[in-house]
């Protein structure tokens, strides 16, 4: 210890000797601002006023407790250690530049106070934690500079303060139990229609569950209400087996005893289009209305994230509240469980975050616990834990207790448990309630959160599902476009007589939208046996409908005509008499298949294709460079493949090496010009590891051939280069991405989402303590772009939903597919625990041939993100050739860049669109 104290004295002397007038003034200012915690008291009051209500009080109390207990402990410890002040103990020491304190030196009370307040404040406001800790560090350093403490004193004070700063929230949680509360106990179930069992298997459990629920609600008036998961399709599934139960359901819905809707299915809200979300609500409200009414709270139990524009959609349907469980990050500590969620459009809804998930109060009850005394004992044991987990986040005195979880029935002993809450905690008034009653009791929140919610601090967000079983995403995108861009507009302009057929097709497609279905995170049989026929029905019947309606609108005749599904004039290359031909199309209409004026395309050299705008130079490995012929600028290298091992599951990607790329591979190349389209094909072989090793930490050394064919095409007049990649996957446990260099550096990029283009930062911050830390991979729709008028690129992808951007914006990677062999695993470093049962899913390895379509749009002068978005929409919505009279007709036109069409349907009650 003597050596430590000697070093401490030397360090003190060196620091004090380094004083100059400027440092002295700053140190004096900091130490006096911290006098009796002045700055921290002010900060606590500001936090109180900012948060408002009880939550503001709890935050201020947390800061004050951390500060006061730290100071009291430090002052008590001084009398234990009795270390003299340095200006008294060190001969010839410089005098302090503030008033000499009279107490002992170790530990520093001011430093303890500062760290106690800073650590407590940082737990309430995580984004300000670095600032608070820096300020506390400055306080400790200032106490040394002014000459009243050794460095070791400040360090000891920091340790004491940190301890009490960490202890403050649990202390406040204990205090909260003593306050009066209103507990709204919502009985519910979360019914996954298909997941680790097939739909019909789960229905065999659904039918008796609904039957017993109806009996319970009719028999026991104490069981005031039950919430059926925010969706309506389970009731339809039940009535297929027991149609006689419909009057009972209607009576309970009308009596506000059974809460249903507003959704038709609980979809994954990120993977489906914005229009699919609208149709989901439309159908859910329609079905719920047939039973009596829909719940007036937009409740979603378990989607893996929430799109930025959802508040606007909800407002459009008259909803002003949203209850959810996943998606919140560090901002949840500041916002609390109730806050205003704002969309880019400016629309807001009150959002209620179920901090403890949608089963936060399930421990209050248990199957088989029926004697009232046993129920009371269970409530006495579990209630404090539940209160401690959710009360600190509440904006007012209303607490949401969710009693239910996946596939659970109603708990008959719940009324006894609710009565026991009042006996165990007399100041807590508990009632079986609805989400509507809870939202009505929530005070107007002060906090505002803007944008999408896709973070995993409290619950895993599971966005590895963006690229799991990618064929599902591709099929869904194709079906959505078929209905939105062809079937519905053609029906609208031909009289709107096929409304019921379209509704039936939408209902079939919506059956594939629940998160366990479209995310690809169920057993193989769900996806291969149940989902494929639904997609097939939408495809076949939708295409037949298009044929019938287009024939009606195009008129009698055998002349080739071209249909354009987009409401602006555009040039397209379509097959006319077996030859790719450029045709000018009317806006959202039909035109004669007559070749338009064009300079055409050419192939001046092997691997080189040219139109009037672009020159594309393709290498033997399938990568290419784009040259802008107007500005003579060259892009970065496009279309490089990167393959990484994947030791994860259907929910989460987990890296396993080594990484292998296509750069430098030698493929077989062919170049040809067909009419107004030039194509370079490249056939190459990627030698990839066959699978993971048996320990699953790395890939095996055995290599297998994975064949790849690129068809890189350039149409006459086009501003984009199209790529069709056909991959014959022979490897297991890996992820394949295509990488394109942007040619620029930027801190942000633009990504397409439901009803929005979102600007996102390139860099993903590292987060400790999250259930699932952020990853570079994110979800997108249609386009992702880095750059603008000064250069860069935009990528468009057909049905692909996952991408990442390098931190400096120099490259964009789009995931083509993931190959995994388990529904869930519990040994992944990227996520805590299991996300489902550990079941093998060999079909999720996606072996065999797969085809991917994407395009590259060079950005620059005259082509920014809006123009690129139009070009990508044209790539994704090809015109089609039919027969008719040959007369041109346009049914709808939208003028002005960058206007985009979303949907065209006939109003149900008016003779208009």
Question: In which residue ranges do the predicted regions lie?
Answer:
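Interfacial segments of alpha-helical transmembrane regions
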Residues: 42-73
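Membrane-embedded catalytic cores of phosphoryl/pyrophosphoryl-handling enzymes
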Residues: 49, 92-178
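N-terminal catalytic cores of secreted or lumenal carbohydrate-active enzymes
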Residues: 179-279, 287-289, 316, 452, ...
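Catalytic grooves of carbohydrate-active enzymes
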Residues: 185-186, 190-196, 201, 347-551, ...
């Amino acid at each position: 210890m003597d050596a430590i104290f000697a070093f401490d004295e030397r360090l003190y002397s060196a620091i004090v000797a380094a004083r100059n007038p400027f440092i002295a003034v700053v140190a004096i200012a900091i130490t006096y601002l911290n006098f009796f915690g002045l700055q921290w008291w002010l900060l606590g009051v500001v936090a109180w006023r900012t948060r408002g209500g009880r939550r503001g009080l709890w935050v201020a109390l947390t800061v004050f407790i951390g500060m006061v207990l730290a100071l009291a402990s430090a002052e008590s410890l001084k009398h234990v250690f009795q270390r003299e002040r340095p200006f008294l103990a060190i001969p010839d020491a410089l005098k302090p530049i503030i008033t000499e304190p009279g107490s002992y030196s170790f530990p520093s009370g001011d430093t303890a106070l500062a760290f106690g307040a800073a650590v407590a404040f940082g737990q309430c406001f995580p984004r300000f934690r670095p600032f608070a800790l820096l300020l506390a560090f400055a306080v400790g350093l200032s106490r040394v500079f002014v000459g009243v403490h050794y460095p070791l004193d400040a360090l000891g004070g920091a340790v004491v303060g940190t301890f009490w700063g960490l202890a403050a929230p649990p202390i406040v949680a204990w205090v909260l139990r003593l306050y009066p509360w209103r507990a709204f106990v919502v009985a519910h179930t979360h019914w996954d229609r298909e997941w680790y069992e097939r739909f019909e298997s789960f229905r065999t459990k659904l039918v008796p569950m609904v039957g017993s629920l109806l009996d319970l609600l009719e028999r026991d008036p104490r069981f005031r209400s039950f919430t059926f998961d925010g969706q309506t399709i389970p009731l339809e599934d039940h009535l297929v087996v027991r149609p006689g139960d419909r009057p009972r359901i209607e009576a309970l819905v009308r009596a506000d005893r059974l809460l249903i809707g507003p959704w038709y299915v609980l979809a994954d809200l990120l993977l489906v289009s914005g229009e699919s979300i609208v149709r989901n609500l439309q159908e859910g409200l329609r079905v719920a209305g047939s039973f009596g009414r829909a719940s007036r709270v937009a409740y979603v139990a378990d989607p893996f994230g929430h799109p930025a524009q959802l508040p606007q959609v909800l407002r459009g349907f008259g909803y002003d509240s949203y209850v959810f469980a996943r998606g919140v990050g560090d901002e949840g500590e500041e916002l609390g469980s109730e806050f205003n969620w704002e969309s880019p459009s400016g629309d807001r809804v009150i959002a209620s975050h179920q901090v403890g998930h949608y089963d936060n109060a399930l421990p209050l009850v248990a199957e088989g616990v029926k004697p009232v005394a046993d129920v009371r004992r269970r409530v006495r044991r579990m209630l404090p834990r539940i209160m401690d987990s959710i009360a600190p986040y509440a904006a007012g005195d209303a607490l949401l207790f969710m009693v239910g979880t996946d596939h659970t029935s109603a708990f008959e002993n719940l009324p006894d448990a609710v009565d026991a809450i009042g006996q165990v905690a007399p100041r807590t008034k508990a009632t079986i309630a609805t989400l509507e009653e809870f939202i009505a009791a929530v005070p107007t929140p002060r906090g505002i959160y803007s944008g999408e919610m896709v973070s995993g601090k409290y619950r895993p967000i599971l966005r590895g599902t963006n690229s799991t079983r990618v064929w599902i995403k591709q099929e869904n995108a194709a079906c959505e476009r078929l209905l939105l861009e062809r079937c519905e507009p053609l029906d609208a302009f031909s009289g709107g007589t096929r409304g019921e057929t379209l509704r039936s097709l939408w209902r079939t497609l919506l059956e594939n939208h629940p998160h366990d279905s479209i995310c690809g995170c169920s057993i193989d049989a769900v996806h291969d046996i149940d989902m494929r026929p639904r997609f097939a029905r939408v495809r076949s019947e939708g295409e037949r409908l298009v044929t019938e309606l287009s024939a009606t609108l195009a008129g009698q005749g055998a002349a080739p005509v071209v249909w354009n599904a987009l409401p602006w004039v555009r040039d397209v290359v379509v097959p006319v008499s077996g030859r790719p031909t450029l045709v000018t199309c009317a806006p959202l209409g039909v035109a004669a298949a007559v070749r338009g004026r064009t300079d055409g395309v050419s192939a001046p050299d092997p691997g080189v294709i040219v139109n009037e705008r672009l020159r594309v130079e393709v290498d033997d490995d399938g990568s290419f460079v784009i040259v802008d012929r107007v500005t003579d600028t060259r892009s970065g290298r496009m279309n490089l493949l990167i393959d990484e091992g994947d030791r994860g599951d259907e929910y989460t990607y987990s890296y396993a090496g080594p990484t292998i790329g296509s750069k430098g591979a030698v493929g077989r190349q062919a170049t040809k010009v067909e009419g107004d389209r030039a194509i370079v094909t490249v056939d190459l072989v990627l030698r990839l590891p066959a699978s993971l090793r048996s320990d699953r930490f790395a890939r095996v050394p055995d290599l297998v051939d994975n064949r790849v064919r690129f068809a890189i095409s350039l149409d006459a007049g086009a501003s984009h280069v199209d790529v069709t990649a056909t991959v014959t996957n022979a490897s297991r446990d890996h992820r394949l991405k295509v990488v394109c260099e942007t040619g620029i550096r930027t801190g942000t990029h633009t990504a397409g989402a439901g009803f929005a283009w979102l600007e996102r930062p390139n860099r993903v911050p590292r987060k400790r303590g999250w259930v699932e830390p952020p990853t570079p991979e994110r979800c997108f729709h249609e386009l992702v772009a880095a750059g603008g008028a000064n250069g860069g690129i935009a990528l468009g992808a057909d049905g692909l939903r996952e991408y990442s951007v390098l931190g400096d914006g120099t490259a964009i990677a789009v995931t083509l597919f993931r190959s995994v062999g388990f529904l869930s695993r519990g040994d992944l470093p990227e996520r805590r625990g299991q996300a489902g049962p550990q079941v093998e899913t060999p079909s999720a390895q996606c072996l065999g041939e797969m085809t991917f379509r994407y395009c590259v749009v060079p950005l620059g002068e005259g082509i920014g993100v809006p123009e690129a978005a139009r070009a990508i929409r044209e790539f994704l919505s090809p015109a089609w050739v039919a027969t008719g009279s040959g007369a041109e007709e346009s049914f709808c036109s939208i003028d002005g860049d960058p206007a985009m069409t979303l949907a065209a349907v006939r109003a149900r009650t008016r003779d208009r669109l």
